[in-house]
Amino acid sequence: MTKRFQHSRRDLRERAFQALFTMEMGGDFLLASQFAYDYDKEVADDKQPSELPVFLLNLVNGVMDHKAELDEVIKKNLKAGWSIERLTVVDKTMLRLGLFEMTLFEETPDRVALNEIIEIAKKYSDDTSAKFINGLLSQFVSDESAAVTD
């Protein structure tokens, strides 16, 4: 039987970022997702893996399935003189995750996804990167999402 833990969506987004980052560095999808989810849970002593939440798997699978498409959108929205290869792996991973959740994952309102990825950026990067990510992704906030929060 697998263990179940309750996590907030913010925690799961952070775990998705960690898994995607690990995969970008050459890690395996399931192992990266499982490790990111189980990290800090002391399940190593239990020998039973935790059941991965659907939200986490949907984010990781979605970004990986649409990686080329997401990269094209990011490339088109970078300022002149910048290339996606010039971005740090952390920033590139956060941009992919945020862009996926805002444009292709209909469960989350755009502004919520944007705010969440900015908070993760502040934790794993610096203020300059968080502002850069905010600037690039904020143009994808839909008019409908803006109308709800205004």
From Swiss-Prot:
Keywords: RNA-binding, Transcription, Transcription antitermination, Transcription regulation. It comes from Streptococcus equi subsp. zooepidemicus (strain H70). HAMAP family: NusB. Pfam families: NusB (PF01029). InterPro entries: NusB-like_sf, NusB_fam, NusB_RsmB_TIM44. Belongs to the NusB family. One of its GO terms (cellular component) is cytosol. The keyword Phosphoprotein does not apply. GO terms for biological process: DNA-templated transcription termination; transcription antitermination. This is Transcription antitermination protein NusB. NCBIfam families: nusB, PRK00202.1-1. Involved in transcription antitermination. Required for transcription of ribosomal RNA (rRNA) genes. Binds specifically to the boxA antiterminator sequence of the ribosomal RNA (rrn) operons. PANTHER family: ANTITERMINATION NUSB DOMAIN-CONTAINING PROTEIN (PTHR11078:SF3), N UTILIZATION SUBSTANCE PROTEIN B-RELATED (PTHR11078). It comes from the Bacteria. GO terms for molecular function: RNA binding. Coiled coil: none annotated.
